[in-house]
Amino acid sequence: MTLTVTILGCGSSGGVPRVGMGWGACDPAEPRNRRRRCSILVEKRREARDAATTVLVDTSPDLREQLLDSDVRHLDAVLFTHEHADHTHGIDDLRPLVLTMRRCIDVYLDERTSAQVRTRFGYCFITPPGSDYPPILVEHRLTSGREVHIDGPGGTLAALPFRMVHGNIDALGFRFGGLAYASDVSAMPEEAKALLRGLDVLIIDALRYTPHPSHFSLAEALALIDELGPRRAVLTNLHTDLDYATLRRQVPAHVEPAYDGMTITTYD
């Protein structure tokens, strides 16, 4: 069985280019510098041409275009890393899929993220008084270190959430077989590191060159990559400081910047 992960977005919270600020150090002539907000699509298949079990991680504000570009016709589940706007505010763009599939979508959140998302988007879970819109989501709880299993046409996909420090809150990363996704992290606890040994691919936050209170800098990301020793590493959550071609030249051969639409194949 194989896993295919598509980078739907690899930009920082404002994307690249940023409204009112432009491209920064990024060359606008390089298509891989145009970055939507962070999200990935995970697909598990028994064989290459089989139907897939399909899981989305986060609903970015760019979700509509992300799903259209990847021709997503169904989802078996959505996993959320944390409650920040750049990871949740596209949630209503799941509604057309619910109408097409004729069923609600299973969403997985930790307790804090659930409370925040329900405050902002409660109508997605329960029809509010006076509304004719039915709910579109069915909630399930995520707990760090406790694997969840998502069934779909490609078989059961296992997702292992792990807790990370993200500035003054916690966020979740996920391990899917030989791949781990850690998009928003400023410190990686030892218990999480223990779950990230022996990876084929690590997708890791590397916001900018200089330190940031809520995200890894490039140097911090490279240090963790060196410590964990994945076969391959992909840098995501990239700010306007980080030009694709320049960054590609600066990192080791087994490390590369993400770009929107990038696909990664690994094992389940």
What are these model-predicted stretches?
Residues 161-162, 182-184, 204-205, 235-236:
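Thr-Gly-centered strand-to-loop micro-motif
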Residues 62, 84, 186, 207, ...:
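Catalytic metal-binding/acid-base residues of hydrolase active sites
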Residues 1-182, 248-267:
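Binuclear metal-dependent hydrolase catalytic cores
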Residues 168-172, 176-202:
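Active-site-proximal loop/helix segments of hydrolase catalytic cores
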Residues 145, 189-268:
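Binuclear metal-ion centers of metallo-dependent hydrolases, dominated by the metallo-beta-lactamase
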Residues 33, 60, 185, 211-218:
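A conditional alpha-helix N-cap/helix-loop micro-motif detector
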